[in-house]
Every structure is written in structure tokens, then in C-alpha cells.
């Protein structure tokens, strides 16, 4: 925690091709070892593949996938009287976007296709159709929050 007040988050610049900040954020989440060129090449090829497979605008498909993945609730561990409770809390919009991007990349990497381009495009298409592993992760998170609704009064 900073002693000198609030530290502003750095501004994310929109990407040069689609002019979207969301695409830049996905590139940043895809990037390994600082290789931005490789990550952006993978993403742009995946978006081209989405356009071929669906016939729709790839940015619209990606944004629909993000809306479907974003969690509304999550649980947070809270220690009260020697016991740990999983307390359901609402997720802030910036954290919703971060979790959605993280889950999208995480479950794309676990898919069985040969190249990362195929994996990423497949996961984005599945998420836009409300299927896929990242949607299952969101539903599991929501189910966990619903199961622990009895502890909601411990919110802080």
C-alpha cells in the first residue's frame, strides 16, 4: 500500500489494427517473456480465423465472449473467530475484465488443438456461444458464491 496516496493505473493504448483497448489487454495477457510481437501475431491470426469460421466481425465475437465469461460474484476467504469463511462478494468491473481475460488465455492454453492460434480462436468462439472451459470456470465461481450465500453478512 502506497504511503503517498492513490497510484493511478497506467493507461492501456488501443491496438493499431482494431483500435480496441480490449485487444491490447488480451495481447498483454497472452504475452510470455515480453514477446509482444509473437503474442500479437497469435491474436491477429486467431481473429482472422474467427472471421473465416463464423463469418461475423471478430471483434464483436470477442466482445460477446468477454461478456459471457465475466463473473458477477466470487468468494473471498474471511477469517472470523478462528474459522475461515468463503464470503461471496460482487466483482468490480475492472476485475471482471481481468478475470475474463485470464480465464480465456488459461483455458485456451489447455485445449487440445495443435497451434495456439487454433486454441485461442476455438476458445473465443466457444465462449461467445456460452460453451467451453472458461464459461465452466465462470459457472463454478458463481455456484461457489451461491453455495456460500449464508455467509454474505460477513462482507466488509
From Swiss-Prot:
One of its GO terms (biological process) is translation. It comes from the Bacteria. Keywords: Ribonucleoprotein, Ribosomal protein, RNA-binding, rRNA-binding, tRNA-binding. The keyword Ribosomal protein applies. Gene3D superfamilies: Ribosomal protein S7 domain. SUPFAM superfamilies: Ribosomal protein S7. One of its GO terms (molecular function) is structural constituent of ribosome. GO terms for cellular component: small ribosomal subunit. Part of the 30S ribosomal subunit. Contacts proteins S9 and S11. Belongs to the universal ribosomal protein uS7 family. NCBIfam families: rpsG_bact. This is Small ribosomal subunit protein uS7. It comes from Limosilactobacillus fermentum (strain NBRC 3956 / LMG 18251).
Amino acid at each position: 500500500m502506497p504511503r503517498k496516496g492513490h497510484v493511478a493505473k497506467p493507461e492501456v493504448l488501443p491496438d493499431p489494427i482494431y483500435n480496441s483497448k480490449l485487444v491490447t489487454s488480451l495481447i498483454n495477457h497472452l504475452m510470455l517473456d515480453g514477446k509482444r510481437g509473437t503474442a500479437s501475431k497469435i491474436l491477429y491470426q486467431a481473429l482472422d480465423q474467427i472471421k473465416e469460421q463464423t463469418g461475423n466481425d471478430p471483434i464483436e465475437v470477442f466482445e460477446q465472449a468477454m461478456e459471457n465469461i465475466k463473473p458477477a460474484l466470487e468468494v473471498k476467504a474471511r477469517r472470523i473467530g478462528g474459522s475461515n469463511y468463503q464470503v461471496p462478494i460482487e466483482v468490480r468491473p475492472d476485475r471482471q475484465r481481468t478475470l475474463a481475460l485470464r480465464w480465456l488465455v488459461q483455458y485456451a492454453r489447455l485445449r487440445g488443438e495443435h497451434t495456439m492460434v487454433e486454441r485461442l480462436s476455438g476458445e473465443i468462439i466457444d465462449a461467445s456461444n456460452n460453451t467451453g472451459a472458461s464459461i465452466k470456470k465462470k459457472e463454478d465461481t458463481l455456484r461457489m458464491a451461491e453455495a456460500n450465500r449464508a455467509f454474505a453478512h460477513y462482507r466488509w
